[in-house]
């Protein structure tokens, strides 16, 4: 089994639950038949075949050097992803799969992917066509923003906020590939999540990812901010990872980002604060009185975004740092207006007198 599946025997148990392909089933049957007909052990049969480990490791190491020479960040990691994708093995078990011959067609695929990564500086996620976010697989395609690891912090905060809320209604503004919406919906099974995006291509991809992950409690709508939403419907949480890179910073981005990812998902071509202002201005109308607003922010934007939120009747609850120690998420709560305090006090007085 391990030989046919291109895995070390130690790693075989990891793949027990996956279904065998017809080619794999046929190959196993052929080996079993040959063992019986020739009265040989499998090790004897395998001994007749060449071990390609040294040759394959040489190809792998040359691939790493090729990416490194062309200035690609994380060349070892990218090479591991490329080899794993082409050889159809888990990245964590790749080293156990190097003894089998790599077919010429697979070598060609690896070369093509390496060239795209090194010479064209195409993002690895677009080359692979899939990427993992919050432990879930997501299809990736050009024209839709690639989800970053730091955005998982925003997801974690949303889950914590809504964990004790009964059947929470959540709105994700600028949902892109659906990463935030789907990850939150997957963790909060009783929730109802709506993702909105102005990009038609992003909406289509998000729906594909919803189907891929078999998530039922999430829907996606093509809408420019709140444009197509029902004003009478109120949410427990509004979350957004808006385009927050300033125009000046955008010009300094790596070619992988600047030349491939959608500009309007990265920058407002201004100071990076435009969408915080637009969302904060209207969010209160779509939130319940106990509702929350959660933003991903740039490393230097906590002070400015805090002021924007406070100017729009939100109270800052927390600012959360990312894995690098930078401010990355800001959580705010809809503040109760002064007239509402008076109403509450009057009601409390009545109740107390009773």
Swiss-Prot record:
One of its GO terms (biological process) is methylation. It is an enzyme of class 2 (transferase). Methylates the class 1 translation termination release factors RF1/PrfA and RF2/PrfB on the glutamine residue of the universally conserved GGQ motif. S-adenosyl-L-methionine binds at residues 174-178, 197, 241. This is Release factor glutamine methyltransferase. Its EC number is 2.1.1.297. Substrate binds at residues 241-244. Pfam families: MTS, PrmC_N. Belongs to the protein N5-glutamine methyltransferase family. PrmC subfamily. Keywords: Methyltransferase, S-adenosyl-L-methionine, Transferase. CDD domains: AdoMet_MTases. It catalyses: L-glutaminyl-[peptide chain release factor] + S-adenosyl-L-methionine = N(5)-methyl-L-glutaminyl-[peptide chain release factor] + S-adenosyl-L-homocysteine + H(+). One of its GO terms (molecular function) is nucleic acid binding. The keyword Methyltransferase applies. Gene3D superfamilies: DNA helicase RuvA subunit, C-terminal domain, Vaccinia Virus protein VP39.
């Amino acid at each position: 089994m391990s030989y046919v599946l291109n895995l070390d025997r130690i790693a075989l148990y990891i793949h027990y639950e996956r279904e065998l392909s017809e080619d794999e089933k046929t190959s196993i049957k052929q080996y079993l038949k040959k063992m019986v007909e020739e009265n040989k052990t499998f090790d004897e049969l395998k001994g007749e075949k060449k071990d390609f480990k040294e040759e394959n490791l040489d190809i792998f190491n040359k691939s790493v050097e090729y990416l490194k020479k062309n200035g690609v960040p994380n060349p070892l990691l990218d090479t591991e992803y490329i080899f794993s994708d082409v050889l159809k093995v888990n990245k964590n078990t790749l080293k156990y799969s190097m003894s089998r011959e790599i077919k010429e067609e697979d070598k060609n695929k690896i070369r093509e992917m390496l060239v795209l990564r090194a010479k064209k500086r195409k993002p690895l996620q677009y080359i692979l066509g899939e990427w993992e976010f919050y432990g879930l697989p997501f299809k990736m395609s050009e024209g839709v923003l690639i989800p970053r690891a730091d955005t998982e912090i925003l997801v974690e905060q949303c889950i914590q906020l809504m964990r004790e809320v009964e059947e929470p209604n959540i709105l994700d503004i600028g949902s892109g590939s659906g990463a935030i919406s789907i990850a939150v919906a997957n963790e909060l099974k009783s929730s109802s999540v709506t993702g909105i995006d102005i990009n038609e291509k992003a909406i289509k991809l998000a729906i594909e990812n919803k189907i891929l992950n078999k998530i039922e409690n999430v829907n996606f709508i093509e809408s420019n901010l709140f444009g197509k939403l029902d004003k009478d419907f109120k949410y427990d949480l509004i979350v957004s990872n808006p385009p927050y890179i300033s125009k000046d910073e955008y010009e300094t981005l790596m070619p992988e980002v600047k030349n491939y990812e959608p500009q309007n998902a990265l920058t407002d071509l201004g100071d990076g604060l435009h969408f915080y202002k637009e969302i904060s201005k209207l969010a209160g109308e779509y939130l319940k009185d106990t509702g929350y607003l959660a933003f991903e922010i740039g490393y230097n934007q906590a002070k400015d975004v805090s002021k924007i939120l406070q100017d729009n009747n939100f109270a800052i609850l927390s600012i959360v740092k990312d894995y690098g120690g930078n401010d990355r998420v800001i959580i705010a709560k809809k503040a109760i207006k002064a007239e509402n305090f008076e109403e509450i006090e009057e009601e409390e007085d009545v109740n107390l007198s009773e």
